[in-house]
Amino acid sequence: GEHEAAVFEAHLTLLDDPEFTGQMEMTIENDSLNAMKAVQNVTDTFVMIFESMDDAYMRERAADIKDVSKRIISNLAGKGGSAFAITEENTVVVAHDLTPSDTAQLDRSKVCGFLTNIGGRTSHSAIMARTLEIPAVVGLGDITTSVKNGDLVIVDGIEGVAIINPSEEVVAEYK
């Protein structure tokens, strides 16, 4: 969709940014590092800068930088494809964070929602979830320690809540 395209357009813009790519080239040449290590070092610097910004929207762009970096490093290492091997239907993915690439690669025939520890309404993973019509709640703090494999979880993306092991009455309300 249009929003999905905008997210990846932002990623392409980053790849075209001479400051970002130029720093990588300089790091390889000046510090005699391999490409993967140079990408990681430059990414760490850019992420630190973006995460320290006052504007929440700009702070959330640090996640985009991490996503682009992860994909570059994965390609340099000759690895590709999805980070998830989900085999069961009605799976709720619970993670510290999901990148836009991770979100786009979720198998929608198996994943019925996702929850993350970090993120906000303007994070690209949240935007991707809305675009793909995947119920999601981001920025839950410590959801990865609260949900165990096999728990029944209701993902209420409208209210921004996750209900872990709800009563039968609550399940009936959400059906």
What are these regions (language model features)?
Residues 74-77, 84-175:
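Acidic, glycine-rich flexible loop/linker segments
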Residues 1-75, 80-81:
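Conserved, well-structured core domains of diverse proteins
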